[in-house]
C-alpha cells in the first residue's frame, strides 16, 4: 500500500530483563508464528531485535544471534540519557567480535539528550544509521536528517510501527518530504547486507 516490500520485525531486547538470548528467540518465534496465523501471509518478513545498549552487553552469550535474519546487520538502541563513550564501545565490541554491521536505531530521537559533540562521536561510529518516517514530520528531526543526507551518511529507513492505530507505518511522509534516491539507497544497503553473508 505504501510501497513497502519488506518487513523487518525487531522486538525490543533488554538484557537486564531477559534470562538468555535463547529464551528471547523462542518467545519471538512463537509470537511470529501466532501473528502469521492471524493475518494474511507475509512472505518477506525478517526477524531481528532492537537491542537496548547496556553496560557489558557485549559480554552476553549468543548476542550475535539477534542479528537480522539472513544478514550481518544488528540493530542497537542507544539509551535515552546523557551520552557516554561506553555506549559506542559496547556496539563496537559486539560488531568487531562477531563481524557484524551495526545499525543505530532512530538516530534522530536522541536530539533531546545528546550535545553536538556527543553526536559527533555517535556519527563517527562505523555504523549505519536508521531513520524513522516520523522524523520527516518533525521540524528539528527533519533538519537533522537532512544534514545526514547531505553528508552522505549510510541511512536505512524504518517505520517503527507497533500497530495500525497510534504507532502505524507512515512511509507516505518519507515519499512527500524526500528524494526517491534516499529510499533506493536504503534498499541497496539492505540488499548488500544479504550478499555479504
Language-model features: locations:
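Short beta-strand segments at enzyme active-site cores
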Residues: 5-12, 46-48
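Hydrophobic residues within beta-strands of alpha/beta enzymes
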Residues: 7-8, 129, 157
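Extended substrate/RNA-proximal surfaces in nucleic-acid metabolism proteins
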Residues: 18-130
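Mid-to-C-terminal alpha-helical segments outside catalytic/metal-binding sites
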Residues: 171-197
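Active-site environment of divalent metal-dependent phosphoester hydrolases
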Residues: 13-17, 52-54, 108-113, 136-139, ...
Amino acid at each position: 500500500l505504501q510501497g513497502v516490500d519488506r518487513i523487518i520485525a525487531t522486538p525490543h531486547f533488554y538484557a537486564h530483563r531477559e534470562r538468555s538470548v535463547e529464551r528471547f528467540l523462542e518467545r519471538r518465534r512463537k509470537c511470529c508464528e501466532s501473528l502469521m496465523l492471524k493475518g494474511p501471509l507475509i512472505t518477506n518478513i525478517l526477524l531481528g531485535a532492537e537491542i537496548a545498549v547496556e553496560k557489558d552487553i557485549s559480554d552476553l552469550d549468543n548476542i550475535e544471534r539477534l542479528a537480522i535474519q539472513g544478514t550481518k546487520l544488528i540493530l542497537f538502541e542507544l539509551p535515552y540519557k546523557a551520552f557516554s563513550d561506553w555506549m559506542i564501545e559496547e556496539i563496537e565490541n559486539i560488531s568487531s567480535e562477531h563481524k557484524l554491521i551495526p545499525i543505530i536505531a532512530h538516530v534522530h530521537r536522541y536530539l533531546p539528550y545528546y550535545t553536538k559533540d556527543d553526536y559527533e562521536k555517535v556519527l563517527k561510529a562505523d555504523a549505519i544509521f536508521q531513520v524513522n518516517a516520523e522524523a520527516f514530520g518533525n521540524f528539528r528531526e527533519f533538519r537533522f536528517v537532512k544534514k545526514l543526507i547531505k553528508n552522505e551518511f549510510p541511512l536505512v529507513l524504518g517505520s517503527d510501527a507497533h500497530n495500525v492505530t497510534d504507532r502505524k507505518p507512515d512511509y507516505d511522509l518519507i515519499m512527500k518530504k524526500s528524494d526517491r534516491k534516499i529510499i533506493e539507497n536504503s534498499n541497496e544497503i539492505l540488499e548488500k547486507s544479504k550478499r555479504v553473508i
